Amino acid sequence: MKTSFVPVDLHPPPRPPQRRKRDIDRVKNGDTIAGNNTRDLDEELDNFVGDYYPEVEVDDNYESSETKDYYYSEKEGEATSFNDKYEDVVVEKRLKEESAGTREGDAFSIFINNTEAWLSIAAEGDTIDDDEMPDFHTFWKGEGNVRSIREARARIMLKYMDKSADPCQDFYQYACGNWAKRNPIPKDKAGYDTFEMLRESLDSVLRELLEDPIPSKLDADDATVKAKYLFQSCMNYEILEQRMERPLIQLLDELGGWPILRPDWDPDGFDWLLLTAQLRLYSNDVLISEWVGPDIKNSNEYVIQFDQTSLGLPTRDYFLQSANAVYLEAYKDYLIKIATLLGASLHNATVHAEELIEFETQLATITSSSDERRNFSELYQRMSVGELRTLVPQVDWRRYLSIVQARPVNFSEPVVVFALQYIQNLVVLLSKTQPRTVANYLLWRFVRHRVNNLDDRFQEVKQKFYYILFGREQAPSRWKNCVTQVNSNMGMAVGSMFVKKYFDENSKNDTLSMTQEIQRSFRELLNKTSWIDDETKSLATEKVNAMSLRIGYPDFILQPHLLNERYKDVVIQPDRYFENTLNILQHLTRVEQDRLGNTVNKTLWNTAPAVVNAYYSRNKNQISQFSRTSRAGILQPPFYHRFFPRSLNYGGIGVVIGHEITHGFDDKGRLFDKDGNLHRWWKDEAIDGFHQRAQCLIDQYARYTVAEVGMQIDGINTQGENIADNGGIKQAFRAYEKWLRLNEEEDETLPGMSATGKQLFFLNFAQVWCGSMRPEATRNKLKTAVHSPGKFRVIGTLSNSKDFAQVFNCPPGSPMNPVNKCSVW
């Protein structure tokens, strides 16, 4: 039976250069582990959760996504590319040793100047009844009253605490010592923590929405119907099993055939540039990364941009260091098994795979490491297409762009290049490589995505690879993958269904008020800073005043005609999952490329409501932690509940707000002005002062060793997030203290706990980061992450906090109250 597919038009009709405005301001999602490029300069790559979920599809998600879910995709990669290296820069589960049993209800004692100070947070004799523990649905569905919600929260907090631990020795152990025992890592995950727990709750809600019957009044052109059809097609395993690999084989044939499957493949007609452009139309960047995004030096203008490629393993070191040989061998075995499932003989698959791996290893050698790409001002080169062709004459850039842009491209067209040396080295490498190997590699990177849209034989092979790479013991249930796919690719349609049923406007207004208070705290701290000159301080104040905040959701998602317009050219059928995915990828590519010629509209939403995370965009000077988060996103426990004591809300979502504000002034955010443009606006004196204080944090975190795997944290790569963590908690606590002074009569305690409001602030902050991760995933994250492990986000931040030391009466010189502290903001 001949299966249908969406063909690539090799000679598309031209479109006029001036594009009409679109309501998508961001469509491209980077390769989640290989460190791809600068494409996200305009996006929210400074996120709060970060890179804690290494099992997230390695480079399977290296395609356009409507709503860039960077909860782990900040990107997983080392930044072999500009953007991934600077995932927080450019503009986007905690390591914990399982503890022994604890004594419920114990108080602890410490000595301050030989005086015993009792700081019992858990009431004596308090016990926990697991049967009474509510799931997160109870919270965000609005069930319960003040008393019941607070009782439930107290039980949860007590459940995770190790009350035998001394908070002045190790506050993470004190706050989270029972987490691992109470929450073993599920077999389908590489790690498990608070965020993953929230996501599972959210995914269950989204599944219910997607499975609800389609109202009879809606037709197939309705965006929410298309989202439901996409979910149905993904879940219809009987059809997937019947079709097997045929849809992919047909598509590969249309693309010229995958040599590994075709011994008769003819190299004479092979055109690597054409195939690269064809794959780009399916939102896949291989060899060269191309995208349309705001110019980092003129954030109001969209421009074509190029950068180095991503790779198929987490970092270039996986290809280049002998210590990673086991992972490279597993990668090759994965490739061979996929090829044989698609019909290759074992002999041919093995021979071709060895050639392909050798080529990708050479490719890794010409990519730049993250350390080499820290100064993105030096990487930035703006030029015309004609000038680029002069510098790299082996590539017909006009032809490539004419295919991708679906219009004639002139030599005068401006482009920004972030990896000129890489591109020049690439064409030399290609000239020395057999066409068969290049074709094999290009299509392997494409096939690796597309097998996710086939039957479970391919998922079983991928699971074996992921077990070696991340330690994940089994693949997630199909419904979880399907929910993720629909929410990533049709996030606004899903968000429309979600917001109509669950969004809480009161939470939105309350959070906005908190944000204003925390912004005020930052301004006060900034004004008291002695190491910044007055002129720089004035400009920084202007920047924080200009910082915008998006809360909730864009209005258009509740207006069916506007929402339907967004997806009008996307054809979705309930029984064609493979073709549906291709249609979406092509749609997202068109939308992205169509941005060229338009002025950047910084008020547009590019994130969907139903996601758990928070973000700061340097190019827009904008916090959008809530555009993706609504009530079943990050505005739910432990971050927020309208019935919580204010201490928990400030220690939860308040710290998130402060974290994102501080990203505007971290090691990369400070380079962008109030309008989101990259230029030198700090005085030399202020720059020197910043570097001195940032170096203190770099050195501090670099001393932390993750005992489970015997590896140290990379203090340089994590500095931006560490700066944001340390600044965020200071601002949030300052705002909370002000609220306390104005609301002395409010009850800031929890039933069954004797903790003060200020103690609960820090305890809730710490419990946000309770979690554990498999050793394999831990090793990978320490090599690639821009966030410190959760344990050290707690210890590192609180050991620098004078407020924490005072609230918990920690003696000077104790581990959580060192004499020498680090502080930037």
What is the role of each PLM region?
Residues 139-159:
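Short, Gly/Pro- and small/polar-rich lid/capping loops
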Residues 149-150, 166-169, 174-240:
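Active-site-surrounding "flap" and adjacent substrate/cofactor-binding loops of secreted or lumenal enzymes
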Residues 160-182, 317-341, 719, 725-731:
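Hydrophobic/aromatic-rich, well-ordered segments within soluble, folded domains that form packed cores
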Residues 163-167, 296-298, 616-619:
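Extracellular/periplasmic catalytic domains that process cell-envelope and extracellular macromolecules
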